């Protein structure tokens, strides 16, 4: 299984290749629009993917997967088809890009990579950027097909917990333990019974890249994960869970992602919630 990551050096060497599409997937929890940063500095040839606008507009939950038709139309307008080699990055390093990597893979893209270290590493190395509004991109056809094995809904989540599945929560420890309030109003504090906690920052190295090899494996094992068993990732709203999914993919370990995450589970009255470690 090939790595889900691409280095800044490798991407720089491939700029301008036919069939290479670069996506700025920057999104911020505080609601800031990522587009101004995209227009201030972006990797040459990049297009901007609006995570909020590309989620399911009919769901009351944040960031839910859209239908294949909606996603395919959105990607087509960005000039991306499912056969392209797609590189996704964000302006933080590794934060929202893995969510869009996961969306693309789950909805039919065949070759998607996350830029390791993102735009901060690219800029720190003095690599070329573009500014201003991007040039219009020719429309493409993206044939989106949902991989149902990649995503978990609440019914499947209940069944998985009842069967003792490994559930790995990417939220900060204080939120997981119920010691800190959730950033979204109306959600209970705590976690699903039996869930494990691996805050997403624990799989990111000091330089903003994803940990690799033994260091990455140790992060999962230290959280209690058995890497010989399947894993379901979750978080607050399905964004940072994808960072754990990315880490598992780097270890050639498949995973599924609970799309509703805590925004769904913690907002219902008929779901079990526990506090503490």
Say what each PLM segment does.
Residues 1-277:
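Cytosolic catalytic domains that perform sulfur/thiol-centered chemistry
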